[in-house]
């Protein structure tokens, strides 16, 4: 006899989610590929109990942000645009300058672009911790090393 299948959709509840901590070494990693993997884990899409409207994701700690790689000629050509909403208030921040001054902002900008731009996305983004060097203050959470292809 065959087993009867259940066609019920599982919906995770906020209290039922178990969160893990992962650490990613950004040294030599391509920025966009790494950001896509990080966004997937922050969102919780790597878990079978993923629910689109609930935060089911894990925490991510990124180290060595200053050693991230960009493919092609993006290091020279890529710039981030911002505007102050005043006439003539256009600003361009080039990636090369940002990597020198605030390397964590480059990774944060790439990951934010891959998360939903709403309240849930802002909540997910708070679980991303980026540090320019090899050390981080989250050793007490005993993060698991995550390999990014």
Curated annotation (Swiss-Prot):
InterPro entries: Ribosomal_uL13 (IPR005822), Ribosomal_uL13_bac-type (IPR005823), Ribosomal_uL13_sf (IPR036899). Disulfide bonds: none annotated. One of its GO terms (molecular function) is structural constituent of ribosome. Transmembrane segments: none annotated. SUPFAM superfamilies: Ribosomal protein L13 (SSF52161). GO terms for cellular component: cytosolic large ribosomal subunit. It comes from the Bacteria. The keyword Transmembrane does not apply. GO terms for biological process: negative regulation of translation; translation. Belongs to the universal ribosomal protein uL13 family. PANTHER family: LARGE RIBOSOMAL SUBUNIT PROTEIN UL13M, RIBOSOMAL PROTEIN L13. Part of the 50S ribosomal subunit. This protein is one of the early assembly proteins of the 50S ribosomal subunit, although it is not seen to bind rRNA by itself. It is important during the early stages of 50S assembly. This is Large ribosomal subunit protein uL13.
């Amino acid at each position: 006899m065959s087993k009867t299948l259940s066609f019920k959709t599982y919906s995770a509840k906020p209290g039922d989610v178990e969160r893990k901590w992962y650490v990613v070494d950004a040294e030599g990693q391509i920025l966009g590929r790494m950001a896509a993997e990080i966004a997937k884990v922050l969102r919780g899409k790597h878990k079978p109990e993923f629910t689109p409207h609930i935060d089911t994701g894990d925490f991510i700690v990124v180290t060595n942000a200053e050693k991230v790689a960009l493919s092609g000629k993006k290091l020279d050509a890529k710039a981030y645009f911002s505007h102050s909403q005043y006439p003539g208030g256009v600003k361009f921040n080039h990636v090369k300058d940002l990597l020198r001054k605030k390397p964590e902002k480059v990774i944060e900008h790439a990951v934010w672009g891959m998360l939903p731009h709403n309240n849930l996305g802002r909540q997910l983004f708070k679980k991303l911790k980026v540090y320019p060097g090899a050390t981080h203050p989250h050793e007490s959470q005993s993060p698991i090393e995550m390999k990014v292809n």
